[in-house]
């Protein structure tokens, strides 16, 4: 005879890993080529001067300098640029 009643099953108990998205370097910080500035899904931020965009929309520095965030254009888009220090 069993001394414990059988436990029920559940369909819960799963969760996806966090993707660590977001801004990695902030305005005014010095940066070198290859450093990641923003990890994002889609284009929350657009690439400005001295910034490249990877296939997963990651923004990275192409030149050495200082990061500058700005809002411009008819649609108030947020751009990230690297300006000479």
Curated annotation (Swiss-Prot):
This is Large ribosomal subunit protein bL27. Belongs to the bacterial ribosomal protein bL27 family. Keywords: Ribonucleoprotein, Ribosomal protein. GO terms for molecular function: structural constituent of ribosome. GO terms for cellular component: cytosolic large ribosomal subunit. The gene is rpmA. SUPFAM superfamilies: Ribosomal L27 protein-like (SSF110324). The keyword Methyltransferase does not apply. GO terms for biological process: translation.
């Amino acid at each position: 005879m069993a001394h414990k009643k059988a436990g029920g099953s559940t369909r819960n108990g799963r969760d996806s890993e966090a993707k660590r998205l977001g801004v990695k370097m902030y305005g005014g910080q010095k940066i070198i080529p290859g450093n990641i500035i923003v990890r994002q899904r889609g284009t929350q931020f657009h690439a400005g001067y001295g910034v490249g965009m990877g296939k997963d929309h990651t923004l990275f520095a192409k030149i050495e300098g200082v990061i500058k965030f700005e809002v411009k254009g008819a649609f108030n888009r947020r751009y990230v640029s690297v300006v000479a220090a």
